[in-house]
Design a protein with these regions (language model features):
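N-terminal [4Fe-4S]-dependent radical SAM core
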Residues: 1-44, 48-83
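Active-site-proximal loop/turn and secondary-structure-junction residues that shape catalytic pockets
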Residues: 88-92, 123-125, 149-153, 187-193, ...
Length: 307
């Protein structure tokens, strides 16, 4: 038995042992720090090109994406039920009436097997009207809002061209007090100018907000097509080894509030995009390595949590 609340177990328990799989939908959204409203280039760690369809390539419709994704998940993973996951870019960065049209289309497909709805966004692209829209689906689906915190330090957010402050993150989280939505928070550990003690601060901040039900932990990795990637090629900087990152997780997980479900422990990138760190293992092997280390060290989520 794992010493932390992992997402796979959470889904099996919630849906009576059925295999539940997230199906990613690209709604063609952009980001305010990419389109000029708050800046250009996007977050410096982000592969902008991967979100920019070639002019000659027609993006599949939402229906086509979902039907293909569900078919693939049934065949490859024996999935029974599905969560519609609007993931790439900022999926609330549009007028509410347009968002409703997009969401309605996605949630009208294969409705008997859709159990959840997940929307990825930024703190500065959510407001009360959009929260109300997402809540309107909560009587039919389990709805979660996935929001990028990335770092709690404004100097870091400025360096990575995030285009929003930690104060905006806190304000967005407070919008979800007493909400029907579950909040998932995304963090990145390993910015080279942040100390381990600073990263501990992420956990203390997450613990403050009872509306945070899920977390995704990522280590910083450098990919082709990113601003940070170009800088790294010119002048490499320190990144986590697998052993160092595992050590950090062994420190952080005991500090994490015990009711929070960990959806992800590390980031992953396509091999053809990854510049560094190359740990030489696939996703499954990394997960196994980390889980074995956590078990060996008898790490228990919440054992060092201070209410």
């Amino acid at each position: 038995m794992k010493g932390y609340k992992n997402y796979g177990t959470h889904l099996r328990e919630k849906y009576n042992g059925q295999r539940v799989f997230k199906v990613i939908v690209d709604g063609g959204f952009t980001c305010p720090n990419r389109d000029g409203s708050k800046g250009f280039g996007g977050c410096t760690y982000c592969n902008v090109d991967s979100f920019t369809p070639e002019p000659s390539r027609k993006m599949p419709t939402i229906r086509e994406q979902l039907e293909e994704g569900i078919k693939r998940a049934r065949t490859s993973y024996k999935a029974d039920k599905f969560i519609v996951y609007f993931q790439p870019n900022t999926n609330t960065y549009a007028p509410t009436h347009y968002l409703k049209m997009m969401y309605d289309e996605a949630l009208s497909i294969n409705t008997e097997d859709i159990v959840g709805f997940s929307v990825g966004t930024r703190p500065d692209c959510i407001d009360a009207e959009k929260v109300a829209l997402l809540e309107s689906y909560a009587d039919r689906f389990d709805v979660d809002l996935e929001m990028g915190m990335e770092s709690i330090y404004d100097e870091t957010l400025e360096q990575i061209n995030r285009g929003c402050s930690h104060g905006e993150f806190v304000a967005a989280v407070k919008l979800l007090e007493n909400s029907k939505l579950d909040l998932c928070v995304h963090t990145i550990f390993g910015f080279p100018w942040e100390t381990k003690e600073m990263m501990h601060g992420y956990i203390h901040e997450i613990n403050r907000f009872p509306q945070i039900k899920f977390v995704k932990f990522h280590h910083l990795h450098i990919v082709e097509g990113s601003i940070m990637g170009a800088k790294y090629k010119k002048e490499p900087f320190k990144l986590f080894t697998l052993e160092e990152y595992t050590d950090l997780l062994c420190e952080l997980i005991p500090m994490l509030r015990p009711d929070i479900v960990i959806q992800r422990l590390f980031g992953i990138s396509d091999w053809d995009l990854l510049i560094a760190p190359n740990w030489g293992l696939n996703k499954s092997a990394i997960q196994t390595y980390i889980d074995k280390a956590l078990e060996k060290r008898e790490v228990v989520q919440g054992s060092l949590y201070l209410d």
